[in-house]
Amino acid sequence: MAFTPKIITCLIVLTIYMASPTESTIQCGTVTSTLAQCLTYLTNSGPLPSQCCVGVKSLYQLAQTTPDRKQVCECLKLAGKEIKGLNTDLVAALPTTCGVSIPYPISFSTNCDSISTAV
């Protein structure tokens, strides 16, 4: 069977489509462990530890694709339901406090499906 240019083009497009990331590689355990140093601060139990901002910046670098950002959002919402005593104002301001600019609000009511990588 001879491969025509049309078949080769279709195979290339199919290969690219299959190789493109459509699912997140970030697990909720990674999100919570990365931000664990922030817990005392976010519950009004202490000052902002420098390691908290290291975690925020690390998580920002990890979540570069739309599926990853959506997953981080869902993980944060889930954690927010489980952790009692969180100061929602401190949670919302945490990226800015740590010098990270993200194009969507941090809130437990954020629609994670609306998050993208567009700035």
UniProtKB/Swiss-Prot annotation:
Keywords on record: Disulfide bond, Lipid-binding, Signal, Transport
Disulfide links within the chain: C28-C75, C38-C52, C53-C98, C73-C112
UniProt signal peptide: 1-24
Any GO BP annotation: lipid transport
Ranges annotated as spanning the membrane: none
GO cellular component terms given for this protein: plant-type cell wall
GO MF annotation: an example: lipid binding
Family: Belongs to the plant LTP family.
Its biological purpose: Plant non-specific lipid-transfer proteins transfer phospholipids as well as galactolipids across membranes. May play a role in wax or cutin deposition in the cell walls of expanding epidermal cells and certain secretory tissues.
Stated name of the protein: Non-specific lipid-transfer protein 12
Species of the source: Arabidopsis thaliana
Underlying gene: LTP12
